[in-house]
A protein has these predicted regions:
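A contiguous strand-loop segment
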Residues: 1-91, 124
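Conserved catalytic-core segments centered on acid/base and nucleophilic motifs
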Residues: 2-4, 73, 102-106, 116-117, ...
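An acidic- and aromatic-residue-enriched active-site/binding cleft used to recognize and process polar
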Residues: 15-17, 77-78, 118, 143, ...
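Short, low-complexity, polar/charged sequence segments that are solvent-exposed and flexible
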Residues: 30-34, 92-94, 157-160, 167
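Alpha/propeptide regions of enzymes that mature by internal proteolysis
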Residues: 90-123
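Surface-exposed patches in mature extracellular/periplasmic domains of secreted proteins
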Residues: 114, 125-133
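Preference for long, solvent-exposed alpha-helical segments and helix-linker "stalks"
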Residues: 119, 125, 165-168
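Extended amphipathic alpha-helical segments with heptad-repeat/coiled-coil character used for oligomerization
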Residues: 131-168
Length: 168
């Protein structure tokens, strides 16, 4: 479960209640550290990101994170429902495991996230044979709004999330 809380400040948190650990750790991607994406090249300039991840081969596989602008994002189980597309021409193709850093590296608000998602394709490229595709849906929030993003068989869907909560 992930939830947001707004008082005079904005808070976002989530539970990661597995019975075992994947080697989770706090991961920090510094501002402007070169970030390579499988189909979208390397971003040389981007926002700083901090979150929980399994780091494999030096790459942070973020479960949840927040960027320096206050946009937070968490991936939660969506088993049996999630489906990712094949790579397509004329759109930005982002692998499922890259989704959190792709969004948080360049969006300063949920409004910017919506714009970025309008020309993005979430694809079925796994990180490696040892790390198959995770079946997830996501909550993305800032101090003004929350959305839920789900990739299913008929494409990417974006829903307003006025309560700022997402469950498995």
């Amino acid at each position: 479960t992930a939830a947001t809380y707004k008082t005079k400040d904005f808070y976002m948190g989530r539970t990661l209640d597995y019975e075992f650990s994947y080697g989770d750790q706090i991961a920090i991607t510094p501002r402007n550290y070169p970030f390579s994406f499988r189909h979208a090249g390397t971003k040389q300039t981007h926002y700083a990101i901090i979150g929980m991840a399994h780091v494999a081969g030096g790459y942070p596989l973020y479960y949840d994170a927040i960027n320096e602008k206050g946009v937070g994002m968490a991936g939660l189980n969506f088993v049996g429902n999630a489906a990712y597309a094949n790579v397509k021409p004329d759109v930005t193709n982002v692998a499922q495991f890259e989704f959190i850093p792709w969004i948080l590296s360049q969006c300063a608000s949920v409004a910017e996230v919506r714009t970025l998602l309008s020309h993005m394709n979430l694809v079925n490229t796994p990180f490696s044979e040892q790390f198959p595709l995770a079946q997830l849906h996501w909550i993305i929030s800032d101090e003004t709004a929350s959305i839920t993003v789900e990739s299913i068989a008929d494409g990417l869907h974006i829903y307003d999330n006025p309560v700022g909560v997402l469950t498995n």
